[in-house]
Each structure stands twice: as C-alpha cells, then as structure tokens.
C-alpha cells in the first residue's frame, strides 16, 4: 500500500522539473507560426473570392520587401486602408484578415520592443473603375502575403 502511494508522490515531485514554462524564444516562434498561418488563410480567402467572382488570374505586382516587423506592419496598414472600400462589401473578409494579421504583428513587435510607424493616412477617393481597383488591391495583398512565407525569418527582426 505504501509503495503505490510513494510512486504517486515521487511522480508529483518530478512533474515540475519535466515541464518548463514557455521561453520568450518559444513564444516568438509560436507567434511567427500563427502569423504565417493567418497569412496563408488570407491567401485562401482571396483565391476563393477570385473563383466566386470569376476574376482573372493574379497579376505580377511589385510590393515592398519585408525587412522586419515594422516594415511588414506598415505595409499591412496601407493595404488595410486600401481594402476599406465604400463601394463594395466583397472585400470585408480579406480586410478583416489583414487587420487581424496586423494586430498579431503589432503584438509580436511589442513583445520584441520594436518601434512602429504610425498608421498611414487613408485616402478616401472614388475610383472611376472600382472593380479594377479591387482586383489590383487583392493582387497586392496576395503577392505580399505569399512573399511572407519565403521571408518568415524576417518576422523575428524589428
């Protein structure tokens, strides 16, 4: 009777030694993984929207390079501003994804003490051809987020 009780007691004593709290490095790695997953989900939403609207395949657009968290967040804010369109509600899911992605990037940046630029001012303008503008904006978002997969190591730098 004492032997099983002693084994249970010994297992409780060794439990805290075998499980360690998450380190800052582990938390950063998990956050980067979550950011990349959300970016991939956003790209999937873009492709689904493109199929629903029978849009042409994506065009090649040059987007700024991802240098670190600050530059990534700044361009995400710019894209978020472009996605907030008074003309259509079709982009609301993608806009919500980009906004959420920026929130995750901001959170990671605060953990790493990164300096962030203020949000760029939104340009409120009516486009002569809003559908073309939406197509162009979606292509920019898709291209930028696809480049994140190749540059995920830049998310560990301010």
From Swiss-Prot:
Gene Ontology CC entries for this record: extracellular region
The entry's keywords: Disulfide bond, Secreted, Signal
Tissue distribution of the protein: Highly expressed in the brain and eye. Expressed at low levels in muscle and skin.
UniProt-annotated location(s): Secreted
Signal peptide: 1-19
UniProt keyword Cytoplasm present: no
Disulfide partners: 114-158
Predominant location category: secreted
Keyword Signal carried by entry: yes
Main function: May function as part of a signaling pathway that acts to regulate the size of the body fat depot.
Family to which this protein belongs: Belongs to the leptin family.
Protein name (Swiss-Prot/TrEMBL): Leptin-B
Lineage, highest ranks first: Eukaryota, Metazoa, Chordata, Craniata, Vertebrata
UniProt gene name: LEP-B
């Amino acid at each position: 009777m004492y032997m099983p009780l002693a084994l249970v007691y010994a297992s409780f004593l060794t439990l805290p030694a075998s499980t360690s709290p998450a380190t800052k490095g582990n938390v950063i790695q998990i956050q980067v993984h979550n950011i990349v997953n959300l970016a991939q989900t956003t790209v999937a939403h873009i492709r689904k929207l493109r199929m629903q609207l029978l849009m042409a395949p994506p065009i090649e657009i040059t987007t700024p390079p991802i240098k670190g968290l600050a530059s990534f967040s700044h361009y995400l804010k710019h894209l978020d501003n472009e996605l907030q369109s008074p003309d259509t509600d079709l982009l609301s899911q993608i806009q919500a994804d980009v906004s959420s992605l920026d929130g995750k990037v901001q959170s990671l940046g605060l953990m790493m003490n990164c300096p962030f630029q203020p949000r760029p001012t939104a340009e409120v303008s009516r486009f002569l051809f809003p559908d073309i503008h939406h197509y162009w904006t979606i292509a920019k978002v898709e291209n930028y987020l696809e480049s994140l997969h190749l540059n995920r190591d830049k998310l560990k730098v301010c």
